[in-house]
Amino acid sequence: MKFLGIDYGQRRTGIAVTDAGGRMAFPRRTIAMTTRDAFFVELLGMVEVECPDAFVVGLPRLPGGEETLTTRQVRNFVERLKRRTTLPVYFMPEELSSFEAEDDLRDAGLRGRRLEAVVDQQAAVRILESFLAVPEERRSLA
């Protein structure tokens, strides 16, 4: 299966995809949030190009598992996404994926605008990699 990973944010959303076999994840794009409609046009346009079998959306929580305002925003986004597509949507619990992605990119020598341009994509890659490591029977649909 091919998955499209999403690191949703109020200002920017990182997108990554897996290969057709669902073994490796690759960064694809960062979508800037201008309007909700424009955002979904761009996201669903990527779906047409990438042809994923399902979405994987990072679900941020505090280290103790508590939900936050951001968690609720992601859940609301997923509900809007599900109204626009028939593809299944999986949640992948995440803690600090953006911070870890930023560390990875800094270690690779990226700074400033170059880092900011791809950090959300790298976070989406981390979300997908975590998801792919979970046995299928333990994956949770949104």
Swiss-Prot record:
It is found in: Cytoplasm. Could be a nuclease involved in processing of the 5'-end of pre-16S rRNA. It comes from the Bacteria. One of its GO terms (biological process) is rRNA 5'-end processing. Its main location: cytoplasm. It is an enzyme of class 3 (hydrolase). Keywords: Cytoplasm, Hydrolase, Nuclease, Ribosome biogenesis. The keyword Cytoplasm applies. Disulfide bonds: none annotated. This is Putative pre-16S rRNA nuclease. Pfam families: RuvX. One of its GO terms (molecular function) is nuclease activity. Its EC number is 3.1.-.-. It comes from Nitratidesulfovibrio vulgaris (strain ATCC 29579 / DSM 644 / CCUG 34227 / NCIMB 8303 / VKM B-1760 / Hildenborough). Belongs to the YqgF nuclease family.
